[in-house]
Amino acid sequence: MFYWIYERMLLSQIQVLPRHICFMISGADLAAAPEKCVQVTGWCSELNTLIARQDLPADAKNQSAIQGLTFHINQLSPEELARFLPEIKKISSIARLVLHYGTTEEVSGTGLEVVVAIGKSGREEITECIRRLAENGIQPSEIDEKTLESCLTFRYDPDIVVKTGGDHLTDFLIWQSVYSELFFSDVNWKYFRRVDFLRVLRDYQSRIRRFGK
């Protein structure tokens, strides 16, 4: 009963939602709670449903809603990948799943866009981007930030990057997350609850984003 009241209190305090959230989890995290990605996706969808029910102009609702969610899983062995892919793919039953692993990209489902990137490093992404620019004959003098961003695999900037159960990050989205807010939760991924997610959102809205200034 108290837990439910506390959740309601947290919900009432959240007025500003990040438009894009990125979770960085390890293979061990996924093995401990393979269903958690689906759960977190459901929490985001529920929040968007609550916003849709509010008496707000359409533009305000779109600005307030969570528009994208990313899960980066730093590394999985081929055996682990085969074991956990069926659970990950369940996300497509409640959202639009964009799944990256190896050289494969699969898209399925509709609704909130959820990107799951397995074993993709930021260094690898930027290296591939530079290689494509060179193959296309782009001259160094023609390259600027927009040119580089146009050939990145992941073309979005997360508002907040969340790491559960630790205080270290992987090198995923090293270009895109340069101005992102960081949140380190002392709760391990397996035990990460809806109330912990709401605490992340409450903390996010209290921050003053400076975007490098």
Predicted segment positions?
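Flexible, compositionally biased loop and terminal segments
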Residues: M1-K213
